């Protein structure tokens, strides 16, 4: 009797710790709309209209989903998928620790129904992040009689979903916390982790990371860049050394200021005068026209 009591108390303490973690990750926050099939999992409604989940029922549904996952002999027959960006990292981490296959990103239509595709697969279980964003794999899984486990919010459609886990499936912390708890429960049921032993993997590894967080690290690895003012000035005299020179041009090489200006050619007496004085500077006068000048306008 004492052994059973200690085991139940340890399980209760673990459940309390998991509920506190889910509460810190805002798993209990729903939306302002509630589907009639999700009303049984709602604890209350706040004054601002947000529905609050009963995290005790969420923990029980996680246990049920973990039992279904463990019942499948080959983990490669399980596909965990997320089209939502906040769940893609959590999906990859869950597949890494449980041995399942992960599809992070957009679902290619026909993956579960079209045998002509190279990416065709027939999984025995499908785990999804959001039934609304992952509606295409739900439809294909229903056509192929594939059991579906999904994290469902208060406004999520429950059609073709076999096991709906009531939780917040829109927050980056809540999605990571849910997949971390599900992965730990699966490993505990498989015997990889002892029942009372703490899992070494931190829940932070399942959280979504912003792309800007890795940018300063790349800059530090590249090394400090030289400032613009610290760069050496280019030596213009070295460009084209065969043709250019840096020596100063003497003043004698420039034309003098006292040089006589070029005089203009004298104007002809009339338009008919063909013999005009040549212009100075070697310019020759233009040849006169061959025909006789016209006397007037005709």
From Swiss-Prot:
Keyword Protein transport: no
Superkingdom of origin organism: Eukaryota
InterPro entries: Ribosomal_uS2, Ribosomal_uS2_CS, Ribosomal_uS2_euk, Ribosomal_uS2_euk/arc, Ribosomal_uS2_flav_dom_sf
Keywords: Acetylation, Cytoplasm, Ribonucleoprotein, Ribosomal protein
Listed Low complexity bias regions: 263-298
One of the protein's GO biological processes: response to salt stress
GO molecular function, one term: structural constituent of ribosome
Residue numbers spanned by region Disordered: 252-298
GO cellular component terms, semicolon-separated: chloroplast; cytoplasm; cytosolic ribosome; cytosolic small ribosomal subunit; nucleus; plasmodesma; small ribosomal subunit
Modified residues (N-acetylalanine): 2
SUPFAM superfamilies in the cross-refs: Ribosomal protein S2
Quaternary data: Component of the small ribosomal subunit. Mature ribosomes consist of a small (40S) and a large (60S) subunit. The 40S subunit contains about 33 different proteins and 1 molecule of RNA (18S). The 60S subunit contains about 49 different proteins and 3 molecules of RNA (25S, 5.8S and 5S). Interacts with ribosomal protein S21.
Listed NCBIfam families: uS2_euk_arch (TIGR01012)
Role noted for this protein: Required for the assembly and/or stability of the 40S ribosomal subunit. Required for the processing of the 20S rRNA-precursor to mature 18S rRNA in a late step of the maturation of 40S ribosomal subunits.
Family per record: Belongs to the universal ribosomal protein uS2 family.
Name of the molecule in the record: Small ribosomal subunit protein uS2z
Organism: Arabidopsis thaliana
């Amino acid at each position: 009797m004492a052994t059973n009591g200690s085991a139940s108390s340890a399980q209760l303490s673990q459940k309390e710790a998991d509920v506190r973690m889910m509460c810190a990750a805002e798993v209990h926050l729903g939306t302002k709309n509630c589907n009639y099939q999700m009303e049984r999992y709602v604890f209350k409604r706040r004054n601002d209209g947000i529905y609050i989940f009963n995290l005790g029922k969420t923990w029980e549904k996680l246990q049920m989903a973990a039992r279904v996952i463990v019942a499948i002999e080959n983990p490669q027959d399980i596909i965990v998928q997320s089209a939502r960006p906040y769940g893609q990292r959590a999906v990859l981490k869950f597949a890494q620790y449980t041995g399942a296959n992960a599809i992070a990103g957009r679902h290619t239509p026909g993956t579960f129904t079209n045998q002509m595709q190279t990416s065709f697969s027939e999984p025995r279980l499908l785990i999804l992040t959001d039934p609304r964003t992952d509606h295409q794999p739900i439809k294909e899984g229903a056509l192929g009689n594939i059991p579906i486990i999904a994290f469902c919010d208060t406004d999520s459609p429950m059609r073709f979903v076999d096991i709906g886990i009531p939780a917040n499936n829109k927050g980056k912390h809540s999605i990571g916390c849910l997949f971390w708890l599900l992965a730990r429960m699966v490993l505990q049921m498989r015997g990889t982790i002892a029942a009372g032993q703490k899992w070494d993997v931190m829940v932070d590894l399942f959280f979504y990371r912003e792309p800007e967080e890795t940018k300063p690290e790349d800059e530090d690895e590249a090394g400090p860049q030289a400032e613009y003012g610290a760069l050496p000035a280019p030596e213009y005299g070295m460009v084209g050394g065969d043709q250019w020179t840096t020596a100063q041009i003497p003043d004698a090489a420039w034309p003098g200021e006292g040089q006589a200006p070029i005089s203009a050619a004298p104007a002809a007496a009339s338009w008919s005068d063909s013999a005009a004085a040549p212009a100075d500077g070697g310019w020759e006068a233009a040849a006169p026209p061959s025909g006789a000048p016209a006397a007037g306008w005709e």
